[in-house]
């Protein structure tokens, strides 16, 4: 019998590849969080497709209160930033965009809930899609945060559970290459902040996705509006 695992699955590129790395060796249950984000309809649709592809159980946890206390452009009617291609490598511009889409303590909330569920079903690991490129602007994607949260688990759980972030040292380009290597269903992943039926192509998440496939020289089957 395979050991159990939990994955925090948004349906995006990163979480899809991270999950796929462990798919053959673990009995995985995927959790998708609904915190009122604009893209939730598409996230749920694509996360379900990914779970069917990888033969995983899928549960959805609603967090309406997180939307109520958040001022993020992801959960309000504020405009989502549309950075230029050059802005993606401009630290100050990237920080500005990150602050606009930042949902305070989101990963802390997600990991705490995932930990609770993992302990209840005796899962050994929690899989997350945190990566190097996003850690530059999002502190809760960093190695330091990962180490600190795993240290917290040691003191806050009866079980030996560990958060695994296999992409923590990877850029988006590296992630696409890894996804291609492990046959991750990247073609059915969804990255857009806006939540259109097709990727908008102009939000930061879409632009980083497009650039990653191009740089990795891997065919991108994503449909973009622009």
From Swiss-Prot:
Instruction: Identify one Pfam family in the record.
Output: QueC
Looking up InterPro entries in the UniProt record yields: QueC (IPR018317), Rossmann-like_a/b/a_fold (IPR014729)
A GO term for molecular function: ligase activity, forming carbon-nitrogen bonds
Please write the reaction equations for the catalytic activity of this protein.
Answer: 7-carboxy-7-deazaguanine + NH4(+) + ATP = 7-cyano-7-deazaguanine + ADP + phosphate + H2O + H(+)
Any keyword Ribonucleoprotein? no
Note on cofactor:
Binds 1 zinc ion per subunit.
Query: Which residues of this UniProt protein bind ATP?
Result: 9-19
Which controlled-vocabulary keywords does the entry list? Answer: ATP-binding, Ligase, Metal-binding, Nucleotide-binding, Zinc
Q: Which cofactor does it need?
A: Zn(2+)
> Recorded E.C. number(s)?
6.3.4.20
Look at the named UniProt entry and state the broad enzyme category this protein falls under: ligase
Q: In which pathway does it act?
A: Purine metabolism; 7-cyano-7-deazaguanine biosynthesis
Instruction: Give residues annotated as binding Zn(2+).
Output: 192, 200, 203, 206
Q: What does this protein do?
A: Catalyzes the ATP-dependent conversion of 7-carboxy-7-deazaguanine (CDG) to 7-cyano-7-deazaguanine (preQ(0)).
- Which family is it part of? Belongs to the QueC family.
From the Swiss-Prot or TrEMBL record, give the protein name: 7-cyano-7-deazaguanine synthase
Q: Which organism is it from?
A: Methanosphaera stadtmanae (strain ATCC 43021 / DSM 3091 / JCM 11832 / MCB-3)
């Amino acid at each position: 019998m395979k050991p159990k695992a939990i994955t925090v699955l948004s349906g995006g590129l990163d979480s899809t590849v991270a999950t796929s790395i462990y798919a053959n060796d673990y009995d995985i249950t995927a959790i998708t969080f609904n915190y009122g984000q604009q893209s939730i309809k598409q996230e749920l649709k694509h996360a379900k497709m990914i779970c069917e592809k990888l033969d995983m159980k899928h549960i959805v946890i609603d967090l309406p209160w997180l939307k109520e206390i958040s001022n993020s452009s992801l959960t309000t009617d504020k405009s989502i930033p549309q950075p230029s291609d050059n802005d993606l490598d401009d630290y100050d511009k990237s920080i500005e965009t990150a602050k606009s889409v930042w949902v305070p303590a989101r990963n802390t909330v997600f990991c705490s809930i995932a930990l609770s569920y993992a302990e209840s079903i005796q899962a050994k690991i929690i899989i997350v899609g945190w990566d190097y490129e996003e850690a530059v602007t999002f502190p809760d994607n960093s190695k330091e945060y990962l180490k600190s949260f795993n240290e917290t688990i040691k003191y806050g759980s009866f079980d030996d559970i560990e958060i695994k972030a296999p992409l923590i040292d990877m850029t988006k380009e590296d992630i696409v290459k890894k996804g291609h290597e492990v046959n991750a269903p990247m073609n059915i992943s969804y990255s857009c902040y806006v939540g259109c039926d097709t990727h908008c192509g102009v939000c930061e998440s879409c632009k980083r996705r497009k650039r990653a496939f191009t740089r990795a020289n891997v065919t991108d089957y994503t449909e973009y509006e622009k």
